[in-house]
Design a protein with these regions (language model features):
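Active-site neighborhoods of metal-dependent hydrolases
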Residues: 161-168, 175-217, 259-263, 267-409
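Divalent-metal coordination cores built from histidine and acidic residues
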Residues: 93-98, 112-208, 297, 306
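Divalent metal-binding pocket/active-site signature
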Residues: 189-190, 198-256
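Conserved N-terminal entry element of GNAT/NAT acetyltransferase domains
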Residues: 1-10
Length: 500
């Protein structure tokens, strides 16, 4: 039986008046009545900064799914009660869901306007884990005290490779760049590992890889980076080496490369956007990863809930043979700025000028299976120009939970919050207090209408905010209230591993 009110410590518990702390046996009936009143009326015994009253609380860790009242003080959940609570402010959440704030492990865009869209999609913590940075200190310093949501970054194999090879730093390397094409010399490999380890010493939460963008990187080089990660108990967040199912380099050999690296080094492997890289082979890719986990290997996987991807048209992904590898053609490519579908001529033009291109590569059935699979967590791969940036969380809740019933609401909340938190907590212990609705957890919360939540962003209008998400709190501070973005607050904090 669950207690009617649970408090963080003895000091928070309802107390009887001091006159009843000593009593005789004949006083028991009266004291029992007063004790019952204290339990039935906890509002008279407890003050909070904020109370979220009467919402349907979903806690994916304990599987609590019940109407509760939450008491928040100093940015932390201090009480989860079946009975009313008293606070300096009370917000009625009746008829709405209260869930842990969503955690996005794959968000590339980290400007204030990007965080605005993330908050309106229920995200309270956003991480750049795939590409990452070569300068961890500078990345965090650029956002200090200025963010709506919590934020974190990996040290990236791509930017560190650019630095080690003396290449011009860009977001992703061009297909003909030395970063993309050249194997690392012994000296460059040593420099690359030094840069990665330095980033981990400065608190990077993971090591990021985009191996498909750096085909010149050997398997030994990747293994060396996994060894560096293992020294710091850091997960490796990886865009795998290849697509397709033919030739020596394919989606299966690429996943096996990471499974082997984890087995040899002990560094956890996290596979990025499996439905985007595996495409029609996604079910078999997930079968491989499930089998690896069943044998005790620490591997995890993410997906996003859209049938199209987006990447740089200049990258090695579009080297000759891309149609066969991905099972698509020119007409499946869409230029975000104009909405046009490409042909041979326009592809050649944009390949020269560069830019991000939308890639329509999956049937809905593949995405649905990926979203619903027990192993996957949800991560947006968020970039401006694609609806996944603004609407991934709401699309899961609206389309895949309510409309198609591919998974339950509790399962969706777990994929959006608890599973991402668990992926990072081995490296960043503070993540143990995120992704949960329990006493002592951070008050990073989302309040939404399960009957109305939906994504509004489209491929033609990719920056439309989600709807049906009424309130979002970051550290107990409203960043979305009554559906309105709160632009004058910056409660977001850096999520960072121990800095040496």
């Amino acid at each position: 039986m669950r207690p009617l009110i649970r408090c963080a410590n003895a000091a928070d518990a309802p107390r009887l008046p001091a006159m009843f702390t000593e009593y005789r046996t004949r006083d028991l009936p009266g004291i029992a009545c007063l004790a019952l009143l204290a339990l039935l009326c906890p509002a008279s015994a407890q003050d909070f900064d904020l109370v979220l009253a009467g919402g349907r609380v979903l806690d994916p860790e304990s599987k609590l799914d019940a109407v509760r009242h939450l008491g928040i003080r100093d940015g932390v959940i201090r009480a989860v009660s079946a009975m009313p609570l008293r606070g300096r402010a009370t917000v009625d959440a009746s008829g709405l869901v209260i869930a842990p704030g969503f955690i996005d492990l794959h968000q590339h865009a980290h400007l204030p306007a990007d965080y605005h869209l993330k908050a309106q999609d229920g995200v309270t913590a956003a991480f750049e884990l795939e590409v990452g940075t070569a300068d961890v200190d500078a990345w965090y310093a650029a956002r200090a005290g200025q963010t709506l949501v919590h934020h974190g970054v990996s040290v990236g194999h791509i930017p560190c490779r650019m630095a080690a090879m003396g290449d011009r730093p860009t977001f992703l390397p061009g297909a003909s760049s030395v970063t993309a094409t050249n194997p690392a010399s012994e000296a460059q490999l040593a420099d690359l590992r030094r840069l990665v380890e330095r980033g981990l010493e400065r608190g990077a939460v993971a090591v990021g890889f985009g191996i498909q963008y750096t085909p010149g990187a050997t398997q030994w080089e990747i293994l060396e980076m996994f060894r560096a990660a293992a020294k710091f108990r850091a997960p490796c967040s990886v865009h795998i080496r290849a697509k397709g199912d033919t030739g020596p380099l394919n989606v299966f050999s690429s996943i096996q490369e990471l499974i082997a690296a984890t087995a040899v080094t002990g560094a956890p492997a996290h596979i990025c956007h499996v439905q985007s890289t595996a495409n029609r082979h996604t079910p078999r890719a997930l079968e491989l990863l499930t089998a690896a986990r069943a044998r005790g290997l620490d591997v995890s996987v993410e997906c996003y809930p859209y049938t199209a991807g987006m990447t740089d048209i200049r990258s090695a992904i579009f080297d000759p043979g891309w149609q066969e590898r991905a099972g698509i053609d020119f007409a499946d490519l869409q230029w975000p700025a104009t909405g046009e579908r490409l042909n041979v001529a326009s592809f050649a033009k944009f390949r020269q000028t560069g830019g991000m291109v939308i890639v329509h590569s999956n049937p809905e059935s593949v995405v649905r299976e990926a979203v619903a699979h027990p192993l996957t967590m949800i991560a947006s791969d968020g970039l401006r120009g694609h609806p996944r940036h603004a609407g991934s969380s709401a699309r899961v809740l609206g389309h895949y939970v309510r409309e198609t019933q591919a998974l339950t609401l509790m399962q969706a909340v777990e994929k959006l919050s608890l599973l991402p938190a668990r992926r990072l907590e081995g490296r960043v212990p503070a993540m143990q207090n995120k992704g949960r609705v329990r006493i002592g957890a951070d008050a990073d919360l989302v309040v939404f209408d399960a009957a109305k939540v939906r994504d509004r962003a489209t491929y033609d209008q990719p920056d439309l905010p989600s709807e049906g998400i009424r309130d979002v709190l970051v550290g107990g501070v409203f960043v979305v209230r009554d559906g309105a973005l709160q632009r004058d607050v910056t409660p977001g904090k850096p999520v960072r591993a121990l800095v040496k």
